[in-house]
């Protein structure tokens, strides 16, 4: 039976210490080799927490598979906009201002793990996160941008 270890690691900076080392040790894997592979697969997400799953396919041969998830939408937005954090009181403060192009970039990165069937739906989902984080889009409230997209006044091209 395949055993799995799921954890969150900082992109490109996993170590043999907790949480990975103690979780993989009992499975008999070469922890240093697994960590090296995780860092290689997550380097594009540096500075962000990334979900990682290590599945031992065959305990006899120690064959394993590493699956890297997509960081949370909020982490992708913070990286795209160079923000430390979102606004703590979104009604009073604006954490940042994004372009529609930046929102599309985040949506494209996030789409594999979203339920959205097309880019337009993914962009609307990312705009929802912008609302929660206090991020304006093109100087407007993200809810307003969502309405403009739904009404067809703003077109989202693939």
Swiss-Prot record:
UniProt name for this protein: Large ribosomal subunit protein uL11
GO molecular function, one term: large ribosomal subunit rRNA binding
Keywords: Ribonucleoprotein, Ribosomal protein, RNA-binding, rRNA-binding
GO biological process entries: translation
Region Disordered: start-end pairs: 1-21
Recorded family membership: Belongs to the universal ribosomal protein uL11 family.
Record organism: Thermoplasma volcanium (strain ATCC 51530 / DSM 4299 / JCM 9571 / NBRC 15438 / GSS1)
UniProt keyword annotation of Kinase present: no
InterPro entries membership: Ribosomal_uL11, Ribosomal_uL11_C, Ribosomal_uL11_C_sf, Ribosomal_uL11_N, Ribosomal_uL11_N_sf
Taxonomic lineage from the root: Archaea, Methanobacteriati, Thermoplasmatota, Thermoplasmata, Thermoplasmatales
Classification via Gene3D superfamilies: Ribosomal protein L11, C-terminal domain, Ribosomal protein L11/L12, N-terminal domain
């Amino acid at each position: 039976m395949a055993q799995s270890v799921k954890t969150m690691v900082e992109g490109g900076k996993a170590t043999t210490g907790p949480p990975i080392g103690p979780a993989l040790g009992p499975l008999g894997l070469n922890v240093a080799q697994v960590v090296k592979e995780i860092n290689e697969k997550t380097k594009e997400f540096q500075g962000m927490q990334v979900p990682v799953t290590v599945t031992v396919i065959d305990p006899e041969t120690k064959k394993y598979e590493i699956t890297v998830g997509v960081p949370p939408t909020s982490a992708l937005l913070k990286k795209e906009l160079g923000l430390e954090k979102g606004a703590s009181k979104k009604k009073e403060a604006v954490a940042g201002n994004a372009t529609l192009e930046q929102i599309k970039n985040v949506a494209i990165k996030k789409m594999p793990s979203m339920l959205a069937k097309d880019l337009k739906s993914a962009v609307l989902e990312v705009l929802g996160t912008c609302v929660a984080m206090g991020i304006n889009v093109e100087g407007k409230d993200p809810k307003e941008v969502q309405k403009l997209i739904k009404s067809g006044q703003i077109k989202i091209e693939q």
